[in-house]
Amino acid sequence: MSDRIDRDVINALIAGHFADPFSVLGMHQTTAGLEVRALLPDATEVWVIEPKTGRKVGKLECIDSRGFFSGVLPRRKNFFRYQLAVVWHGQQNLIDDPYRFGPLIQEMDAWLLSEGTHLRPYETLGAHADTMDGVTGTRFSVWAPNAQRVSVVGQFNYWDGRRHPMRLRKESGIWELFIPGAQHGQLYKFEMIDAHGKLRIKADPYAFEAQMRPETASLICGLPEKVVQTEERKQANRFDAPVSIYEVHLGSWRRHTDNNFWLSYRELADQLIPYVKWMGFTHLELLPVNEHPFDGSWGYQPTGLYAPTRRFGTRDDFRYFINAAHQAGLNVILDWVPGHFPSDDFGLADFDGTKLYEHSDPREGYHQDWNTLIYNYGRREVSNYLVGNALYWIERFGIDALRVDAVASMIYRDYSRKEGEWIPNEFGGRENLEAIEFLRNTNRILGEQVSGAVSMAEESTDFAGVSRPQDMGGLGFWYKWNLGWMHDTLDYMKLDPVHRQYHHDKLTFGMLYNYTENFVLPLSHDEVVHGKKSILDRMPGDAWQKFANLRAYYGWMWAFPGKKLLFMGNEFAQGREWNHDASLDWHLLEGGDNWHHGVQRLVRDLNHTYRHHKALHELDFDAYGFEWLVVDDNERSVLIFVRRDKVGNEIIVASNFTPVPRHDYRFGINQPGKWREIVNTDSMHYHGSNTGNGGVVHSDEIASHGRQHSLSLTLPPLATIWLVREGE
C-alpha cells in the first residue's frame, strides 16, 4: 500500500484523539491508486461495494486489529459512490460510509454563524434529517471551537466515540458529520476531547427534543414546520387591545388524583384551555417549558433551550396544545430565560473545556443567587444562539409573545453583588452593555421578522425606557411588568383598614410614572411562594373581610391602567401558597356555593366586562384614558377615577377600602346623565353584603370637586364598583 498512513495517526484515530478524520478516512487518491480507508471497530471483514450492481469492487485489508481497514481499488481511477459490506460477529451489514460525503455547511451559513448574524442558526446547527447523494440520514453539527476532537455518539453506533468523529470547519469552529441511517427518534450526544484533553459528553445545545430528567440525551427530531401568524393573534397583542393573562405552571395546575402525576400536553389542551377561555382571559402565559433537569427551578434553569420538556409529552404534543389555545382564541406567552443556565455537566457549562457560553471570570459569569452561569452576550455566537431561539419559538411553535425573565439581573453587572464581587464595564459603569445590546437586538429582530409578536420584560429596577424603542435609547420591549405597582398595592391591601388612610399614596403613586412605560400589572407566581403567603392570606381581617378585600382589590386592578396578569389559583382565592409538586386546591370549589366560587365568578365577570368596554383598555398608555375624580379622600380611604376610550366614552370606578359603607357619597363627574352599575364586588353574586345602588343612578346638577354635575352613591364596604353611562 502506497502513501501508508502513519502508525501514530492510526493510534490517535482509534484512541479518539485525531482531529481531522476526513484526511484519513473515506476515499482518497494515492500514488498507488484510489484507496478507501475505514475505522470499523469489531469488524472482521470489509468489502467495497458498487451500489448500482451490488458487485464487490475490492476488499479492504485489516491494518490494525482494533478496526482500521484500508485497500487500493484495482482498475478504478475516478471517485465514485460506494458502500461498505461489513462483517460483524458473523453477520454482514451493508452501510454507507459517512466519510465519502463532502462539507455540509454552506460557506454563507458558516460566515453568518461566525459573525453572529445568522437569523435562524437552528436551521443549520443541531441534528437535521437529510438526503445526500441519494442516501438518507441525519446531518449533525455543533459549535465547539476549542475541542480537540468531537464525535457523534448514539443508539446508531453503540455510543462509541471512535466510530463517528466529525469534521472541523476551522473558519467557524463548527464540527459536522452526516451519518447515513441515523433516524428520527434515536438518542444522541456529542462526545469530545476538550481543550484540556478531558473527555466530555454533551447534549446538543440545538436539540429539538430531549430526554426527561434524570436522562439527558438529545433526540433526533426534525425541525418543526412553521406556524402562520394570523391577523387576529397579532391584533390581540396591540397596545389598545384587552390583555388579560392567566399565568400557568403546567406541572401543577391540575394533577391526576390517583397518583399525583402531571397532566399531559393533550390533557391540558382538553382541560386547561376551555377553562381559561370560559374565565374570559385573553392570553395564556406558560412558565418555561424548555427542558430542565430540576423540577424545583420551575423551568427557570433550562438546559434544552430548543426542546419543550418531555414531562408532559412530545414536541408535537406541545404544538397540539398551542394550536388548541389558538383555536380557542387565546394567545400564548412563553416565559423565556436568556439570562442564565445551570452548571450541569451535560449542558453548556465548560462546553468544549473552555468558558464558551459563559464568562471565564466568575464575577461576570456566575450567578450567586441561583448557582447558575451567565451567558457571555459579547460573544457573537452566544448571542446568536439566544436570538435564534426567540425566533424559533415564535416561528416554529406559534408562540405569540415572550416574557423575558429577570431582566435586571442581565443588564446590571452588580446585580445582587457586593463591592469587589463584580467588574465594571469598559466605561467604569455598572451596566452590562453587552446584555443591553443583546436585548435591543433581539427585540429589533422580532419586530422585523415576526411583526405582531411581542416581548415583555420582568424588570425590577427603574432602568429607563425598558418598553421604549431602541432609537429612543430604550430596550425595545413592547411591555414591562409593573413590579412597583404590585408591591405598593399589596403593601396597602395587607394593612388593617384603620391604618390605610396613612398610606393612601401607595394606591395613587403608580399614576405618577404610569406613562413612562407600557405596563402589565402582575400578580405572578413570585408573589405566592417562599413565605409570602397567598394573595388571599395577605388580606387583613376575618374570613369575610379577607374575601371582601380581595374582591375590592381585583376590581381596582382590572380597572387601573395597564394590562392584567393573574397567576393560577388566585382566580378562586386559593388559601395556601403555590406548591409546584401538587395540584391547585380545586377541592375548594367542590360542594356548595362558597366564597371561592364568588371570587371565581368575579374574576370571570371582570374579564368579560373589561374586554367588552374599550374605555378599560384602549388608552392604557395615553393620559387621555384616565382621570382622577377623587384622589385625596384618605380619611375615608375612598378613591374614584374615570377610564376613557378614544371617542370619550367613560367608565367610573369607585373603591372604598374600609369596612364602613359610605352612603350619599357625592363627587363631581364630567358627563351628566344616567349611570348603570356594571360591577359591584360586594354583590351577593360574589358572596358580598349586597350593598349598592340598585343598578342605576342619575346625576345631579350639583357642583362638586370643581365640576358642575355630580353623582351621589352608596359605596359598599371593602368594595369596588364600576359604572357606565347609558344616556342623558
Swiss-Prot record:
Keywords: Carbohydrate metabolism, Glycogen biosynthesis, Glycogen metabolism, Glycosyltransferase, Transferase. GO terms for cellular component: cytosol. GO terms for molecular function: 1,4-alpha-glucan branching enzyme activity; cation binding; hydrolase activity, hydrolyzing O-glycosyl compounds. GO terms for biological process: glycogen biosynthetic process. The active site is at residues 405, 458. CDD domains: AmyAc_Glg_BE, E_set_GBE_prok_N. HAMAP family: GlgB. Monomer. This is 1,4-alpha-glucan branching enzyme GlgB. It comes from Citrobacter koseri (strain ATCC BAA-895 / CDC 4225-83 / SGSC4696).
